[in-house]
């Protein structure tokens, strides 16, 4: 009872102090209901009230605005009820606030039951509710108009369930009428960011390139962030953002990809009222007005400002009409059963709906259901060149594009602007000139790709500017973030128009950019440090034939000699028959042997034939001549083959390479090997399903220290410093070029691991794609591409032509090449002298014994038993230096 009395006294005093003599209050109390994520809107609400109260024009300010603010938790129905009742119990005349799908029904029910007007910038409701003034215009008509203008027949519709199903229903009805293919997905309840990514990837597999995103700004930013990460913002994609705050959305990263982005804007930044408000807004104290100074003005904050204008204008109208809006009765009890509505609430609602003012969001009018009407929405378009106003939409004219800036999916004309050509510093493709510091623009560079870009620009008739890629990478997509780096990233994100560089054509790159026909064919190759030239051995003259062949020749020599000896013994035609009628010989001369091919003469004959010198004896029998003939044929083939290989082995210094192929690399552990950290070579091994390459990739990704290098120059330097313990895998063209550069200590080994090509790249859907492709084909047919390669690879080589050693001159033989021959000669001479000495000693001893025996025989003079005479025999068939009984 006491509390009721105190409450009555309070309102009586408030009525006496707050009302003028005409019954209209001097102070209008309004309520404010804000959620946690409406910090800037709260600041805009208080600042708009402050602007009104500080207006010096008393005609415009016949009363003072006062506000009471409550914060509500929309997920808690008790919190929503308590917040509304708190406002109602304070005797507010109208409530400004926000709602979502969970709190909307509660708030609108209270407003309808208690006749309390609720002015909101939240999304428009589908139902026809009373006492709800909707500051935000509906987008349904504008969206349908643009879908028809762009002639979208297949697209994805991502919508937030909190915003209602009116747009979804309208789109589905239009899809049935126009035979559209619409894939609708609700994203309102998604909390996991990865789920957005999965949806986009699924749509991309369906070849979807057009998206209509109907969400609040925060959720749109989240979705677009995933679009950028997945690289789905390149040319060819089109995103329509069903939101009234196009300039509130973070589009910097998206615009660089080249995708076309269309959106709606309710705040006209060229409006003097907007400009004046922003000038004051940015000067506010951040501590008193959070998110005012250092944050851009949201369109919901502009709607909040306009809501205060509407409330103020409505009460001005009521004051002019002398409408009594005083609070009476049980106005402070919102939970009374039955509910007791405020009798003056209908007058206030009617006044609010009758308001027509110009605000920051344009013309503000309402229909009988409190919805915005007769409004204009600007249509914006974002491309690589930036955002621009493409047209406008209203209820009467529908979408009206600006005639001088017709909307198009094509890139802007390249004839009247300078094309940005991204490239990479890589010899011999692009290099700084020695005096580049004194030069400017494209004149600072030289190389194969510099000349190629000049030729292409000449054929396409464009002006261009060479731009070195900032991170020094060719282009790969990060497995985690899905962001492209290098030159591919420059094209994908719209920072360049063409890439003229040693950029390999691959499948993953072709998905996000376009390539011309290859201007150079190549493959992955192995670079190693050139091994030291092997010094020839003393017996290097034996190298033309394997040691197994030499052993076989020795055995063949011995075998032929033995066979010749045996054949000569068995054949009667090799024996000399004795003739007793012949004239008597000189007793002092030895007789001819009956067979010339004893074992030693057979060996001598075979050796003479093998050395192609011959001897003074030859076989007389047919069998012996057959043996000699096949031996001569054998020696002819062997000596000819030996002579043919001898020149190559003695004049060419061989280098023994420890690695000859990728298989050799994979099955050893002493020599490390790696690739460029970001490029097609690394991607080739990562994606390969061949066992050898899978094994190599497994080693490379787990090797410590890392075998991946940031640049090709780093990889080459590592090869040169590793003393043969590191192999670098790179494109064959680069490998061949470096092999021709000083200090000439690297070499390519083995064949190419794959076959691919370099191409000129352009963004997806670029208008330059076809002209550039035709230019490359024309340069190839004219032979200019071959001339450029010869110019930069071989004409400017520093190590001589690759085959110059065999074609231009023959290396002079050194002593080490033929030292073994001299050793054999010296050894043979020494052996001959030693044998001669032995023969001399043996003969001297034999002669001494013979002379002594002869002397003794002469002293005794025994009668000879037979007619015989002793002769020393030197001929084959007798004991050397022995005596034989020869008949006289």
Curated annotation (Swiss-Prot):
Gene: Gria3
Principal place of residence: membrane
GO cellular component: AMPA glutamate receptor complex; membrane; parallel fiber to Purkinje cell synapse; postsynaptic density membrane; postsynaptic membrane
Modified residues (Phosphotyrosine): 871, 881
The reaction(s) this protein catalyses: Ca(2+)(in) = Ca(2+)(out)
The protein's name: Glutamate receptor 3
Membrane topology: Multi-pass membrane protein
Homology family: Belongs to the glutamate-gated ion channel (TC 1.A.10.1) family. GRIA3 subfamily.
Cystine pairings recorded for this chain: 85-334, 744-799
Chain residues carrying a lipid of type S-palmitoyl cysteine: 615, 841
Cell compartment(s), UniProt: Cell membrane; Postsynaptic cell membrane; Postsynaptic density membrane
Main function: Ionotropic glutamate receptor that functions as a ligand-gated cation channel, gated by L-glutamate and glutamatergic agonists such as alpha-amino-3-hydroxy-5-methyl-4-isoxazolepropionic acid (AMPA), quisqualic acid, and kainic acid. L-glutamate acts as an excitatory neurotransmitter at many synapses in the central nervous system and plays an important role in fast excitatory synaptic transmission by inducing long-term potentiation.
Positions on the Extracellular side per record topology: 23-546, 643-817
Intramembrane segments: 597-612, 613-615
GO molecular function, one term: AMPA glutamate receptor activity
Additional notes on this entry: The postsynaptic actions of Glu are mediated by a variety of receptors that are named according to their selective agonists. This receptor binds AMPA (quisqualate) > glutamate > kainate.
Glycosylation sites (chain numbering): 57, 260, 374, 409, 416
Keyword Transmembrane helix (UniProt): yes
Database matches in Gene3D superfamilies: 1.10.287.70, 3.40.50.2300, Periplasmic binding protein-like II
Complexes and interactors: Homotetramer or heterotetramer of pore-forming glutamate receptor subunits. Tetramers may be formed by the dimerization of dimers. Interacts with PICK1, GRIP1 and GRIP2. Found in a complex with GRIA1, GRIA2, GRIA4, CNIH2, CNIH3, CACNG2, CACNG3, CACNG4, CACNG5, CACNG7 and CACNG8. Interacts with CACNG5. Found in a complex with GRIA1, GRIA2, GRIA4, DLG4, CACNG8 and CNIH2.
Residues annotated as signal peptide: 1-22
Superkingdom of the organism of origin: Eukaryota
Segments on the Cytoplasmic side according to the record's topology features: 568-596, 616-621, 839-888
UniProt-annotated binding residues for L-glutamate: 502, 504, 509, 680-681, 731
GO biological process, one term: long-term synaptic potentiation
Residues passing through the membrane, by range: 547-567, 622-642, 818-838
């Amino acid at each position: 009872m006491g509390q009721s009395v105190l409450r009555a006294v309070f309102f009586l005093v408030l009525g006496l102090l707050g009302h003028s003599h005409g019954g209209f209050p001097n102070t209008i109390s309004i309520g404010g209901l804000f959620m946690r994520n409406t910090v800037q809107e709260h600041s805009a609400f208080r600042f708009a009230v402050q602007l009104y109260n500080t207006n010096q024009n008393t005609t415009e300010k016949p009363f003072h605005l006062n506000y009471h603010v409550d914060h509500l938790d929309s997920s808690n129905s008790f919190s929503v009820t308590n917040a509304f009742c708190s406002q109602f119990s304070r005797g507010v005349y109208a409530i400004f606030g926000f709602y979502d799908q969970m709190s909307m029904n509660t708030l609108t029910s209270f407003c309808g039951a208690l006749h309390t007007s609720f002015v909101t910038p939240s999304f428009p409701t589908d139902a026809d509710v009373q006492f709800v003034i909707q500051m935000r215009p509906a987008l349904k008509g504008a969206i349908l108009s643009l879908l028809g203008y762009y002639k979208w027949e297949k697209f994805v519709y991502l919508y937030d369930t909190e915003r209602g199903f009116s747009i979804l229903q309208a789109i589905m009805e239009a899809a049935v009428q126009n035979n559209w293919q619409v894939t609708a997905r609700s994203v309102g309840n998604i909390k996991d960011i990865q789920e957005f990514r999965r949806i986009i990837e699924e749509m991309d597999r369906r070849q979807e390139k057009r998206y209509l995103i109907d969400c609040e700004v925060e959720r749109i930013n989240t979705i677009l962030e995933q679009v950028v990460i997945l690289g789905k913002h390149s040319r060819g994609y089109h995103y329509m953002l069903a939101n009234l705050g196009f300039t509130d959305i973070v589009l910097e990263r998206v615009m660089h990809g080249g995708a076309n982005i269309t959106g709606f804007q309710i705040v006209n930044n060229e409006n003097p009222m907007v400009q004046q408000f922003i000038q004051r807004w940015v000067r506010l104290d951040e501590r008193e007005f959070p998110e005012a100074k250092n944050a851009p003005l949201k369109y919901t904050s502009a709607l909040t400002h306009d809501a205060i204008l509407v409330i103020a204008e409505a009460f001005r109208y009521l004051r002019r009409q002398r409408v009594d809006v005083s609070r009476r009765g049980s106005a402070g009890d919102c939970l009374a059963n039955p509910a007791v509505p405020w009798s003056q609430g209908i007058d206030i609602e009617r006044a609010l709906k009758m308001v027509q003012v110009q605000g920051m969001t344009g013309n503000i009018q309402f229909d009988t259901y409190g919805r915005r009407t007769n409004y204009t929405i600007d249509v914006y378009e974002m491309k690589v060149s930036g955002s621009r106003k493409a047209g406008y939409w209203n209820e009467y004219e529908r979408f009206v594009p600006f005639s001088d800036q017709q909307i198009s999916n094509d890139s802007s004309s390249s004839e009247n602007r300078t094309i940005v050509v991204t490239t990479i510093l890589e010899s011999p493709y692009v290099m700084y000139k020695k005096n580049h510091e004194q030069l400017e623009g494209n004149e600072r560079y030289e190389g194969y790709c510099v000349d190629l870009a000049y030729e292409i620009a000449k054929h396409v008739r464009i002006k261009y500017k060479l731009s070195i890629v900032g991170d020094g990478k060719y282009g790969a997509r990060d497995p985690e973030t899905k962001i492209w780096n290098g030159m591919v990233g420059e094209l994908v994100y719209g920072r360049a128009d063409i890439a003229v560089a040693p950029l390999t054509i691959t499948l993953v790159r072709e998905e996000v950019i376009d390539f011309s026909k290859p201007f150079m064919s190549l493959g992955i190759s192995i670079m190693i440090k050139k091994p030291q030239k092997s010094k020839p051995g003393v017996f290097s003259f034996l190298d033309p034939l394997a040691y197994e062949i030499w052993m076989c020749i020795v055995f063949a020599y011995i075998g032929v000699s033995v066979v010749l000896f045996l054949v000569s013994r068995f054949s009667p035609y090799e024996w000399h028959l004795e003739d007793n009628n012949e004239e008597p010989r000189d007793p002092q001369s030895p007789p001819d042997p009956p067979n010339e091919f004893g074992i030693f003469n057979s060996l001598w004959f075979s050796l003479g034939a093998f050395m192609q010198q011959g001897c003074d004896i030859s076989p007389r029998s047919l069998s012996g001549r057959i043996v000699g003939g096949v031996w001569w044929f054998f020696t002819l083939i062997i000596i000819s083959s030996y002579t043919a290989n001898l020149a190559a082995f003695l004049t060419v210094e061989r280098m023994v390479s420890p690695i000859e192929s990728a298989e050799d690399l994979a099955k050893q552990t002493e020599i490390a090997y790696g690739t460029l950290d970001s490029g097609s070579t690394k991607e080739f091994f990562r994606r390969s399903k061949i066992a050898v390459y899978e094994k190599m990739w497994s080693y490379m990704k787990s090797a410590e220290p890392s075998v991946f290098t940031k640049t090709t120059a780093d990889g080459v330097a590592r090869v040169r410093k590793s003393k043969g313990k590191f192999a670098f895998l790179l494109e064959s063209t680069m490998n061949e070029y470096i092999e021709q550069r000083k200090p000439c200590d690297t070499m390519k080994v083995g064949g190419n691991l794959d076959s691919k090509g370099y191409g000129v790249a352009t963004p997806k859907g670029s208008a330059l794609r076809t002209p550039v492709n035709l230019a490359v084909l024309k340069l190839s047919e004219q032979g200019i591409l071959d001339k450029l390669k010869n110019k930069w690879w071989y004409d400017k080589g520093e190590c001589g032509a690759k085959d110059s050693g065999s074609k231009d001159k023959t290396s002079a033989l050194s002593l080490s090449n033929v030292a073994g021959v001299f050793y054999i000669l010296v050894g043979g001479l020494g052996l001959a002298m030693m044998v001669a000495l032995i023969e001399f000693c043996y003969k001297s001893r034999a002669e001494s014994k013979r002379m002594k025996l002869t002397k003794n025989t002469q002293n005794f003079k025994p009668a000879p038993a037979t007619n015989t005479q002793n002769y020393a025999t030197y001929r084959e068939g007798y004991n050397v230096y022995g005596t034989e009984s020869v008949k006289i």
